[in-house]
Amino acid sequence: MKQSLTLVFLVAIGYATAYTTSHDYSGGYGGGCYGSDCDSGYGDSGYGGGCTGGDCGGGYGGGYGGGCSGGDCGNYGGGYGGDCNGGDCGNYGGGYGGGNGGGCSGGNCGGGFDEAFPAPYGGDYGNGGNGFGKGGSKGNNYGKGYGGGSGKGKGGGKGGKGGKGGTYKPSHYGGGY
């Protein structure tokens, strides 16, 4: 019995190690991620670095303080304080990311929608809050509401023009949409 438990334990450790390795938490909590695919959980540049490449998606990619540049910066890409530049800066990327500190430039800097974070602060809220540029082209149907209104209240400057609204895109962890 003891041998069986030991074997199960070792297999579990091996699986956990393989899973973590395969998901490549590159950059961790402070580094940068550069390449065609930086996708992985808390990796991608973590909480302080920048993410540059074709796909910087996955979890908190782009981090809470860095910039996100590339084709797809995924969930939380762009972070809470950095810039988001590229074709798709994903959920919250360019939202709070383009909002409380940085800018959002690209084809889609709109915010996503997450049940845990029901207020969909997209590029509209972000750029409005900082008083420069118009809101992102897609605010997931909430652009007009949060663009100018929240911008004037929080940014000090002139609120950005609200986005025209867009299609609802649910949040998902592990990559951009």
From Swiss-Prot:
Protein's UniProt name: Eggshell protein
Bias kind Gly residues: ranges: 149-166
Source organism, top-level taxon: Eukaryota
Signal peptide: 1-18
Record's keyword annotation contains Repeat: yes
Region (Disordered): 149-177
Sequence repeats by residue range: 25-41, 42-59, 60-75, 76-91, 92-112
Organism: Schistosoma mansoni (Blood fluke)
UniProt keywords, alphabetically: Repeat, Signal
Region of interest (5 X approximate tandem repeats), residue spans: 25-112
